[in-house]
Amino acid sequence: MNEQMKQYTGTKTVKAMPMTMGEAYERKLLKNGVRPSECETDKAGYLVEYEDGYQSWSPADVFEKAYKPSETRLDRLRIECDELRARSKELDAYLNEGYEKAAAEIGRSLTMLLVLQSSYLHNYLDVLEALLLTTKKE
């Protein structure tokens, strides 16, 4: 990757429904010149509609890696819990390399703040997981 390029992270909310590549071809949703072979017509994917109304087709593996269902409050709670768990795990991995190592890299006060952040992340994660359990039972 070009070193002048910076990393960007974004999130989009889309509407989607399952659709095969063959159906996408019939609805002219594939890029110009793309015609699925006979074995590709049944390839699983999704019709994706963006906020501006633009529609496209995405292969199932690509779509499912980028998007999670967020139709209900429980869906959104699962997403938040999964994202928080991943951030917490990453921070813990850094801190588990040792306080002294972190302090040498970023300073003692910042390391102490990261330890505090980790503690708050764990507490918040406990609350989210309790909400998930309670919501599932109702």
Description of each model-found segment:
Residues 97-112:
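Acidic interhelical loop/turn segments
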Residues 130-138:
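Long amphipathic alpha-helical coiled-coil segments
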Residues 1-95, 113, 119, 126-130:
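Motif-centric detector for short Cys/His coordination patterns
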